[in-house]
Curated annotation (Swiss-Prot):
EC number per UniProt: 7.1.1.-
Cofactor needs: [4Fe-4S] cluster
Protein name: NADH-quinone oxidoreductase subunit B
GO molecular function: 4 iron, 4 sulfur cluster binding; iron ion binding; NADH dehydrogenase (ubiquinone) activity; NADH:ubiquinone reductase (non-electrogenic) activity; quinone binding
Pfam families: Oxidored_q6
Family: Belongs to the complex I 20 kDa subunit family.
Cofactor binding, note field: Binds 1 [4Fe-4S] cluster.
Quaternary structure (record): NDH-1 is composed of 14 different subunits. Subunits NuoB, C, D, E, F, and G constitute the peripheral sector of the complex.
Biological role stated in the UniProt entry: NDH-1 shuttles electrons from NADH, via FMN and iron-sulfur (Fe-S) centers, to quinones in the respiratory chain. The immediate electron acceptor for the enzyme in this species is believed to be ubiquinone. Couples the redox reaction to proton translocation (for every two electrons transferred, four hydrogen ions are translocated across the cytoplasmic membrane), and thus conserves the redox energy in a proton gradient.
């Protein structure tokens, strides 16, 4: 049998771990994603949202507003002029929030080693999951969502605090 943490402060036993598991199950199975397609990887992200891969079974719904999203998916090359706008979108998302960096260009700048390209999205905002490839297949993106779901289930139910600005 699994042991549960019991709190007798109110005089009655209260099981706290079950509430944590319930909240994390709900969060992990209803991922509302802000699709932020910047280049070729966005085409694979759109293909992943189609009926062939059926992302609805994971509870993933693509949203257009950052205020209705908890997962930001950055797919493609991020230019330095666009970096502050990306940070503003991230700041508008409610806590807890997670970021998936999709593709070589989003992860490391890809083949564009120029003055105008951000060499990795993690220089602007914190990234939770990296999806490698140029352009990564929808199956890789699907696997990244499953890893994110496992990560969310392991976190505490308390609200995740966003780190300070990186720029």
């Amino acid at each position: 049998m699994a042991e549960h943490q019991v709190n007798y402060a109110s005089g009655l036993p209260v099981v706290l771990t079950s509430v944590d598991k319930l909240v994390q199950w709900g969060r992990s199975n209803s991922l509302w994603a802000l699709s932020y397609g910047l280049a070729c990887c966005a085409i694979e992200m759109m293909a992943a949202g189609g009926s062939r891969y059926d992302f609805d079974r994971f509870g993933t719904i693509f949203r257009a507003s950052p205020r209705h999203s908890e997962v930001m998916i950055i797919a493609g090359t991020l230019c330095k002029k666009h970096a502050e706008f990306t940070r503003r979108l991230y700041d508008q998302m409610p806590d807890p929030k997670w970021v998936i960096s999709m593709g070589s260009c989003a992860n490391t700048g890809g083949m564009f080693n120029t003055y105008s390209t951000v060499q990795g999205v993690d220089r602007i905002i914190p990234v939770d999951i990296y999806v490698p490839g140029c352009a990564p297949r929808p199956e890789s993106f699907q696997f990244a969502l499953m890893i994110l779901q496992k990560k969310i289930r392991k976190e505490k139910a308390s609200r995740k605090i966003a780190p300070k600005r990186l720029i």
